[in-house]
Amino acid sequence: MLDILREPDDIRIECEADNVDCTVITEIRDERLYVYVTAAASRPRFICLRWNTRFTEPTRIMGDKWERSYGDMEWHSLNGEIFMPWYFLANSADTTVGCGVMTGAGSFVSFQCDASGCTAWFDVRCGGVGVRLDGRRLLAGIVVCCRYEGISAFEAARRFCRVMCERPRLPEKPVYGSNNWYYAYGKSSRPEVIRDAALTAALAGENENRPFTVIDDGWSVNPCAGPWKPNERFGDMAEIAAEYKKLGVRPGIWIRPLHDVVLEKEHPAWCLSRINDGDQNSTPTRCLDPTVPEVREYISATIRKMTAWGYELIKHDYTTYDLFGAFGCALNGKITIKDGWSFHDETKTSAEIVSELYRLIREAAGEAIIIACNAVSHLSAGIFEVYRTGDDTSSRHWSRTRAYGVNTLAFRLCQNDAFYKIDADCVGLLPGKISWSLNRQWLVLLAESGSPLFISVHPEALNEEIKAALTQAFSRNAVQTDAAEPLDWLYNNQPQAWLVNGQKREYDFVEEYYPALLSGSTQNY
């Protein structure tokens, strides 16, 4: 079976021009392989490490993602064209091997496995060009490799995630509650979010650990685009937070920290040199460059403003898309598709810049809980308490919830409590849309997964049966002591057989709702 905790058989260096002085040093100590890169004149782009080995037994492979997953996680055959960010697992019979890098790496690291061995690519670029190290010694990543025998592949994945992250930042109390996006989709108002808070408080009953009610996109003057000031439908956001607390919920709020259309027009020099092209649902946009000192001050002040308003949870979104110009589903190996652009500070790698941004947000938020959405997973671990692991579920299209929700819960639940608390996204309830039979199963599985449960409920979708089920789910999830494990995930990427607290559970996530053709858009809710 594969073992990469040894000196690589080959090392290759790709620089912006001819390699003049870039060197790579690997050191093995304490059962880890340290990868260092040094250059004075050369500007390295990629470092390639290769371990040659023949796979002699039938082997299945499962890797992680740069940011969220998009219904695309699964165990697959050896395929050298699939590049797996951060880590992967190889399973053969009762043996599972985990290969990856420690969280907080200094570069974007991806792996590939083929029949003749394994390759690790260290993307040390600054944006789309080689980084200017100026003689600095960069720790590009720390490689780890563990072999597990006699335990399930899921348990092996869970243990390996704990190896990769030594100090996760976890909330003092379990996080759960409601979010208005999945029924309002950005069209909301102060009276409606107050109603949401009252409903959430009622569903939580006498739970000592009170739920959050998160105001998602739609509260600011320009939806999804800043500046982060309330529109006339919401008014004073501090008053809303205070009302939430009176009702018995903890206030949460959504923000896109790297996009402010007013600031970008006033200070074009503060923007990234690259314009995001957008997709069929979004227009091309400029975004702020977090290596510009004034931008860092702006981001910090914006986050501090929200905590001063009284919000105890901040959900930040779009940092991967805004920084690199694509959603994770469009990326394979390289974190950014476009070449020829860089951040204002060319002396740091993209990974270092992302980590600095996340630490800035963390520091500005103080004691507030952070949910990171469309964020870089391996660079969020140890900094943020909660991490959205999959693209949006839906209150309208069950195929989307099944593909994006069930899949990400199964394949990233191993990260729960190891990197952060995983957020597999909401149970969305709209009248006349997804059948309660299906949504009920999704609700129960989430509530008993040991990971955060969020619901998004239009009041007209409720009846007494649904209210009772939501109350029971909140009661269960308020403590999050359950343990769940997918049993059929080696051959089913939307697992229906689960082990919950040692008891086997069978779900039917299809019923009469056969998989439908999705539009291909990441925003088709």
Region spans (language model):
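Aromatic- and carboxylate-enriched substrate-binding clefts and catalytic-loop regions
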Residues: 74-76, 87, 209-429, 466
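Active-site-proximal substrate-binding groove within the catalytic cores of carbohydrate-active enzymes
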Residues: 123-125, 134-140, 179, 346-525
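Hydrophobic, Leu/Ile/Phe/Ala-enriched alpha-helical segments that form helix-helix packing faces
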Residues: 37-41, 87-93, 197-204, 244-245, ...
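Short, acidic/polar
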Residues: 189-203, 293-307, 439-440
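Carbohydrate-recognition beta-sandwich/jelly-roll modules
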Residues: 1-211, 313
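Short helix/loop capping segments that flank catalytic or ligand/cofactor-binding pockets
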Residues: 186-187, 223, 456-458
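Glycine-rich, acidic and aromatic/proline-enriched surface loops and short helix-turn segments
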Residues: 199, 206, 220, 260, ...
